[in-house]
Amino acid sequence: MIIFKNLILKISSLRFAISLIIFIAITSGIGTFIPQGNSNKFYIDNFDSAPIFGFLDGEKVLKLQLDHIYTSIWFLFTLILLCISLSACSFRRQIPSLKASLKWIEYNNEKKFSKLQLTSSHPINQDGDHISKVDLLLKKRGWKTYKFKSHISARRGLIGKIGPLVVHIGLIVLLLGSAYGSFTSQSNEQYLLPGESLDLVNESTNSKANIKLVNFSIERESDGIPKQFISKLNFSSEDLNINEIKTAKVNHPIRFKGLTIYQADWAISNVVLEIDNILYQLQLKEIPEIGNQVWGVLVELGSETKKNFLLTIDNENGPLKISNVENFSGNNLYINDRPLEVNSSKVSLKKIIPSSGLIIKNDPSIPFIYFSFILIIFGTIISLIPTNQLWIFVNKESHKLSIGGLSNKNLVGFKKEFFKLSEEIKNF
């Protein structure tokens, strides 16, 4: 029993909870640094030759479950342990403290007043119901009072005592919601060309919806660096009687019937070429060996002797580079520019077709996450409200009225109010 009590004491301590929060923050940071959810081969190929931090190779990453941190056993155990710590702290400290603050504390002799933060006393005449007058004054000033025969207990701002408990509940909901989301959330990345669409099916309601990419554009800085990606999407559903257009941007996702659509990436998927008076739409693939965000395709050109040429592009505005695979010498093609003669073939660029990379995510934990944030913010705000307490004692033998006050926050502000009240009581 003693061992169990000591264990609860350690688990419910602030130091233990802070240690867990720091550990979760560090591991979450590692999770943003190490790609999550890829195949075992990916980690072996990428980290065996260049270990993370100099010692974490692919095998160690897999063994330590760093490839799926947020669903790993040790990470979930840490979340559960933090929930237990916060719950233990709430039951051991916050709830007893709240219960104690609900009780009216009696200060029925002058010796007790010396222990308070603020005290004052005034002589009174023998006649007059001073207790009732003070009680009425305090109620007018917004104080909750409890009147005894010879003394009064008063308090204000008790809601501030609830704040830490609300924050703890919010953190617990956040942790449980995050753990729930790591198992139940689903995401799918799709690349859509303008005019293309995809169907969404909600199995729980047996309803269907269609998302169509109306337009995709890229805003660039003056030096050509991408500034913003913008997808204009049409949402339609006969089952839900919906037909509306919404815009997705980076950091500005679209929320639709429990789904969140993020603007995540882009690509140049197709180019339209006119080769010897015939139009061809060629599909491009990313070529990381050449450079970051470079797309291309290998084509045969020539009216008599066919030769391979590599077409590459890295910008939705062009140019398209045509390179001879033998010596990689080449020329640039611009949209609607005059045709180039390549190996006796006339080639012109008619159109560049970029595609929008969208991540469609279904995360049932989002309402829990938002609710937890509301609780945490609300709890933090009301925690700032000071809890003030007053005691008034009338000693009929010495004909003296004593006033004492206590505040857990903003003692300077409470001190001004205390002595103002003291002067009003003195003038009775």
UniProtKB/Swiss-Prot annotation:
Belongs to the Ccs1/CcsB family. One of its GO terms (biological process) is cytochrome complex assembly. It comes from Prochlorococcus marinus (strain MIT 9312). Keywords: Cytochrome c-type biogenesis, Membrane, Thylakoid, Transmembrane, Transmembrane helix. This is Cytochrome c biogenesis protein CcsB. Pfam families: ResB. May interact with CcsA. The gene is ccsB. It is a multi-pass membrane protein. GO terms for cellular component: plasma membrane-derived thylakoid membrane.
